[in-house]
Every structure is written in structure tokens, then in C-alpha cells.
């Protein structure tokens, strides 16, 4: 193989690795975001049980 061919193969491998890595990272971020939202909802549930916190954050607590 010549130098050009080796350089082309190197660029192809780097590009492929970057694209695959980017797609996997994007998928994992959605999972992280969903988990983060669940934690946030759990924290609001605790806040909604506390009357002073509920009074200050009524937009996050369902009416009861």
C-alpha cells in the first residue's frame, strides 16, 4: 500500500469511529435525560407533601 492509501484508510477509520461514537452518545444522553426527569419528579413529590414548599411551588404540584 502506498502512503496515500494508508492515509485514506486512517481517515476512514477515524471518521467511522467518530460517527458511531456520536450516535451512541446521543442515545445515552436521552436515557440520562429521562432518568434525570424521574429524579426531578420524585423530588417534587416530596416537596408537594410539605405545605410550605407546596405553597411556594404550586405549578409543580397537582391540585388536591
Curated annotation (Swiss-Prot):
Expressed by the venom duct. Disulfide bonds join 47-53, 48-61. Residues 1-21 form the signal peptide. The keyword Nucleus does not apply. Residues 22-45 form a propeptide. Coiled coil: none annotated. Residues 49-51 are annotated as: Lacks the Ser-Xaa-Pro motif that is crucial for potent interaction with nAChR. It is found in: Secreted. Keywords: Acetylcholine receptor inhibiting toxin, Disulfide bond, Ion channel impairing toxin, Neurotoxin, Postsynaptic neurotoxin, Secreted, Signal, Toxin. GO terms for molecular function: acetylcholine receptor inhibitor activity; ion channel regulator activity; toxin activity. GO terms for cellular component: extracellular region; host cell postsynaptic membrane. The cysteine framework is I (CC-C-C). Alpha4/7 pattern. Alpha-conotoxins act on postsynaptic membranes, they bind to the nicotinic acetylcholine receptors (nAChR) and thus inhibit them. Has possibly a distinct nAChR binding mode from other alpha-conotoxins, due to a different three residue motif (lacks the Ser-Xaa-Pro motif). Belongs to the conotoxin A superfamily. This is Alpha-conotoxin-like Lt1.3. It comes from Conus litteratus (Lettered cone).
